[in-house]
């Protein structure tokens, strides 16, 4: 069950990622999902707090996009479960 969290979406140069930083029953976790490939590029990883989760998810996404020669765009974080 999700207690609180944030998410961001990246759509750039054919890439589509979703970044998450959430506090749930397992604690605070971060993850990054590749929507196009339908797979996790960074599965749930424990972090200290939501802010650290945002930083780690951003770093994972940046590294992933660099491999595709794409620059990380500015992120807009939204409250979890919002559209």
What role is predicted for each listed range?
Residues 1-29, 83:
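Short N-terminal "domain-start" leader segments
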Residues 33-83:
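Mixed-charge, Lys/Arg-enriched low-complexity segments
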């Amino acid at each position: 069950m999700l207690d609180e969290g944030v998410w961001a979406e990246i759509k750039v140069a054919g890439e589509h990622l979703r970044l998450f930083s959430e506090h749930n029953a397992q604690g605070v976790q971060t993850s990054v999902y590749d929507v196009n490939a339908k797979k996790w590029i960074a599965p749930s990883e424990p972090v200290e707090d939501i802010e650290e989760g945002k930083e780690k998810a951003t770093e994972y996404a940046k590294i992933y996009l660099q491999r595709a020669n794409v620059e990380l765009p500015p992120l807009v974080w939204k409250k979890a479960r919002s559209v």
